[in-house]
């Protein structure tokens, strides 16, 4: 059985599951840019109806902005890295509803704003792999490890992002939020990925950047839960991780 080496320990495993945003790809490069566009357009839209955000707009998605409105960081325990598409729509639509827009219209308007922001990303194919990811995936393939993706994103956007990164062929299972009844931190996504890869939970490792990933792994009985803390620079938000790394340069695989 291949060995995964991390922080001085060697773990036998047959499969590794990866979160997508903030794990496979740089979250700020993708969703920081998206959030910047969405919040800007939301602010403009609300000004047109004589309204404003009910509070600090950074608290909507858990972003950190500079004086010019550019997003420079995010709360690792906030909506930007963890919320599903539907949850994000709900957070944003509530602002319009509070300003007097009927809920159904608020949802439609938010979906339009979010779609425009995503189309901007598509034009740039805005996906950047985390440091060391591509060599690490090559090591995994060489060791015949089975790889899967478990993400709170939806199927069509996940497929796009993996294709932009050029890594689609590495993964034998891609479990997205729209494929399960209960998303993270429930164990269902990890359990489904293990079934599709043909491995047992105790032979499988999960790597992710949120504590929801760690809780999912623990709930599914996975062998090890590895947290990635590169975006926040701290591991405090990864309370349920077995061990924490900055990026994939701190992981190696051997046979």
Each model region followed by its residue ranges:
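Charged, low-complexity surface patches
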Residues: 85, 129, 151, 206, ...
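Conserved phosphate-coupling serine/threonine residues in phosphotransfer and NTP-handling enzymes
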Residues: 23, 151-153
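N-terminal helical cap/lid subdomain that shapes the substrate entry/recognition surface
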Residues: 5, 11-131, 142-143
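Short, flexible loop segments at the rims of nucleotide/cofactor-binding pockets, characterized by
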Residues: 123-128, 152, 182, 223
């Amino acid at each position: 059985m291949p060995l995964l080496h991390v922080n001085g320990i060697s773990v036998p495993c047959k499969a590794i599951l990866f979160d997508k945003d903030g794990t496979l790809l740089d979250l700020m490069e993708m969703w920081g840019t998206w959030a910047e566009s969405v919040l800007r357009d939301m602010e403009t839209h609300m000004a047109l109806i004589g309204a404003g955000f009910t509070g600090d707009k950074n608290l909507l998605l858990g972003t950190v902005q500079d004086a010019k409105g550019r997003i420079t960081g995010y709360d690792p325990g906030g909506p930007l890295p963890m919320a599903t598409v539907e949850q994000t729509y709900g957070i944003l639509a509530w602002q319009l509803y509070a300003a007097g827009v009927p809920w159904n219209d608020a949802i439609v308007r938010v979906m339009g704003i979010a779609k425009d922001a995503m189309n901007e990303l598509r034009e740039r194919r805005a996906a950047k792999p985390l440091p060391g990811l591509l060599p690490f995936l090559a090591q995994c393939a060489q060791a015949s490890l089975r790889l899967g993706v478990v993400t709170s994103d939806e199927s069509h956007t996940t497929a796009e992002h993996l294709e932009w990164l050029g890594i689609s062929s590495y993964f034998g299972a891609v479990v997205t939020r729209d494929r399960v009844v209960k998303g993270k931190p429930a164990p269902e996504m990890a359990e489904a990925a293990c079934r599709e890869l043909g491995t047992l939970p105790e032979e499988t490792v999960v790597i992710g950047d949120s504590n929801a990933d760690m809780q999912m792994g623990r709930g599914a009985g996975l062998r090890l839960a590895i947290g990635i803390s590169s975006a926040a620079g701290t591991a405090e938000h990864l309370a349920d991780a077995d061990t924490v790394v900055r990026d994939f340069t701190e992981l190696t695989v051997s046979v």
